[in-house]
């Protein structure tokens, strides 16, 4: 039952940066003993609001009210002293220090300038026990997993008696087991009567944890859902993007050209049986399958990331000898990999460099001098045309959201003479609005005659975007479905292991 008096309230919060209005008149309430989710596209204002709550930013207008008292935080220490803790995606801990030292950093128990280590470890042990964690407080943090680091961050908040704890995309680097443990801890914190704010783009997490959901769009408050029995995925999407769920995919029938890509009995590591399929110019073919189906392995083999062990790849009827990615690129075949952070972007380089790095070789001056004029124009063109949200072309790409990183990778391949594009989980970890933009890029590529082969474990996405769906099961093709005829039941039936295989 919702309490009558909120513990935390935002009253008319606005925040303006030079030339940018990040938040406008944000007002809503949060109650003790509840998990209150914040949702919205990237740039909707969620993180800015958390930074105001934590004392990183001062609001331009409005106020934060905690337990009936209007607060004005001059810095993060003031917010901590008021019982506010933020658990960010990038954890703020010191690897070389012990677990206990991290938990009580800034308030180490001491006497005469000497730290009382026995008391420090005892108190830290109590906080860890509170969270159900069996960790030696004297262990250097660097020896712990990311999930354990997160528990240390939460223990640090509890050591400061935080009554308001906000989590910002907390599961992005966690294993399934660590996510389950985090959810257990959050539910315990809720039982203790704390206010939990939870920011995530993963709707399954939102529905699993939340008692209320507030949606932001373009820096403005849209709506707060308080009856979780009456809210569903479609209602949240519509609130976030201002469109019905059917409009997100935007598929329309199109005509195709000649065969552009063909696989003839291709095998690669992780692909159990020879794979044969074709994609025509202007056609979008979706590869769907469960974990272990072999989708990513097939694409890596096609692109030269691993070696094709049998069969032949053809582009425009011509056999292509692909032993490494440069061979695929030279033939006009590009790949946006599943793990964009590890295999797609160069994190410590600029957006400009990440867009230009592949096509740069074609535009050098005198065979050896970088053509800065071309690079600036090319990067700026793709930043505008793909709506890449960045302060500028020189911004490090690691500082961009996942959706904008993916658009920069697409900009890289749009700088090349593309015939075929392979997209492996192109919208994983991307918010709904950015997904819509990625889909529009895919449709635009198809309209230009590019053959699109994209793999996704998101079945509604495959059914909503692809002209034809190829279903893979345990390293082989289990069947094909046309867009107009396909439904989730058919696709899942094809993707599920055969009974005899499952028993064996």
Swiss-Prot record:
It is a peripheral membrane protein. Residues 8-243, 256-499 form the ABC transporter domain. Its EC number is 7.5.2.12. The keyword Transport applies. GO terms for cellular component: ATP-binding cassette (ABC) transporter complex, substrate-binding subunit-containing; cytosol; membrane; plasma membrane. The keyword Repeat applies. ATP binds at residues 40-47. It is an enzyme of class 7 (translocase). It catalyses: L-arabinose(out) + ATP + H2O = L-arabinose(in) + ADP + phosphate + H(+). Keywords: ATP-binding, Cell inner membrane, Cell membrane, Membrane, Nucleotide-binding, Repeat, Sugar transport, Translocase, Transport. PANTHER family: ARABINOSE IMPORT ATP-BINDING PROTEIN ARAG, CARBOHYDRATE TRANSPORT ATP-BINDING PROTEIN MG119-RELATED. Part of the ABC transporter complex AraFGH involved in arabinose import. Responsible for energy coupling to the transport system. Belongs to the ABC transporter superfamily. Arabinose importer (TC 3.A.1.2.2) family. The complex is composed of two ATP-binding proteins (AraG), two transmembrane proteins (AraH) and a solute-binding protein (AraF). This is Arabinose import ATP-binding protein AraG. The lineage of its organism: Bacteria, Pseudomonadati, Pseudomonadota, Gammaproteobacteria, Enterobacterales.
